[in-house]
Amino acid sequence: MAQLETRTEPMVVNFGPHHPSMHGVLRLVVTLDGENVIDCEPVIGYLHRGMEKIAENRTNVMYVPYVSRMDYAAGMFYEAIVVNAPERLANIVVPKRASYIRVLMLELNRIANHLLWLGPFLADVGAQTPFFYIFREREMIYDLWEAATGQRLINNNFFRIGGVACDLPYGWLEKCIDFCDWFAPKIDEYEKLITNNPIFKKRIEGLGTIERDQAINWSLSGPMLRASGVSWDLRKVDSYECYDDFEWEIASEKEGDCYARYRVRVQEMRQSLKIIRQACEMIPGGPTENLEAKRMATEDKKSEIFGMDYQYVAKKVAPTFKIPNGELYTRLESGKGEIGVFIQGNNEVTPWRFKIRAADLNNLQILPHILKGAKIADIMAILGSIDVIMGSVDR
């Protein structure tokens, strides 16, 4: 009996740029053989706004409000890196109290970032309920930010060259500790609901596996790198701000799959709580109301309570602050990985060159590699595990 010859042709499918699971205006041109992915080409640039060129035409004080719009889930991190670069270039020393306040804001932002990753990621793989839980917790972080900076999600405009815009308000540290006490059991609740859920584990275990050597060769960072067995965290490696004062551990896993990346982010939320608690207890001068009372009761103006480390800003930088001649690259660990700034000054109020390294752009580059051989139904789970925000990818 003669057999009919069957012939299959690859099919090209466009995901995005306005797909509900795209995490922004990202377009994936996917080539399929049946249900198997044989090629993937990410198309980026839909949200390009020229943030680097804007930086080169603004003073630092003018530019800080812009940067939180790059990654709306990590606004504090971008504010920090934008002021860290000229600080290091000009050798400006930040008071210890201001450094502690910065750490508090950064770690709250890390928790908020991971929460905003967790909800949509679980929705992508079919678990809708936790999506509503994460906004309950984020609301408390928003309240803390609003009390300290006046804004909630973006445009906090809180970091300054030499410190922060203002000291913490009365009762803020107490409210922050209350949040830690309230949020710690919520992480346990997430773990009971998700971590050992057989449906969830079956859905994402073994997906998007990245080996240790691959993670290093592709210049991955953050949870993407640590989930592949590399214990690399810039808070430990570079010891910026005052992270050396705290006891905490680097969260890492060895499997390198979507499930390992989930585990790393959950562990990081626990470690961030540990850092926040220590910072609230160890901040020089204690709560603002106590610090002001001590200053009023101290007649000796040379007392350490009036010293540099008890201030919230080292020096009021003038709007005409000139960035010194020279160049350097500075970096920090955000919720997504390493973000950095290469700055080149020429003794003018605006930088001559301002290059931004976004963590999620570098992490996104490995997507075509790990999608090859995967099923079409797994594309969204693998993409979601990377954690990209297109505002910072495109800049």
Swiss-Prot record:
Keywords for the protein's UniProt record, in alphabetical order: Membrane, NAD, NADP, Plastoquinone, Quinone, Thylakoid, Translocase, Transport
Molecular functions (GO terms): NAD binding; oxidoreductase activity, acting on NAD(P)H, quinone or similar compound as acceptor; quinone binding
Entries under Pfam families matching the protein: Complex1_49kDa (PF00346)
Enzyme class of the recorded protein, top EC level: translocase
Record bears the keyword Phosphoprotein: no
Subcellular location: Cellular thylakoid membrane
Keyword Transmembrane helix among UniProt keywords: no
Catalysed reaction, written as an equation: a plastoquinone + NADH + (n+1) H(+)(in) = a plastoquinol + NAD(+) + n H(+)(out); a plastoquinone + NADPH + (n+1) H(+)(in) = a plastoquinol + NADP(+) + n H(+)(out)
InterPro entries: NADH_Q_OxRdtase_suD (IPR001135), NADH_UbQ_OxRdtase_49kDa_CS (IPR014029), NDH1_su_D/H (IPR022885), NiFe-Hase_large (IPR029014)
Quaternary structure note: NDH-1 can be composed of about 15 different subunits; different subcomplexes with different compositions have been identified which probably have different functions.
Family: Belongs to the complex I 49 kDa subunit family.
Functional note: NDH-1 shuttles electrons from an unknown electron donor, via FMN and iron-sulfur (Fe-S) centers, to quinones in the respiratory and/or the photosynthetic chain. The immediate electron acceptor for the enzyme in this species is believed to be plastoquinone. Couples the redox reaction to proton translocation, and thus conserves the redox energy in a proton gradient. Cyanobacterial NDH-1 also plays a role in inorganic carbon-concentration.
Protein name: NAD(P)H-quinone oxidoreductase subunit H
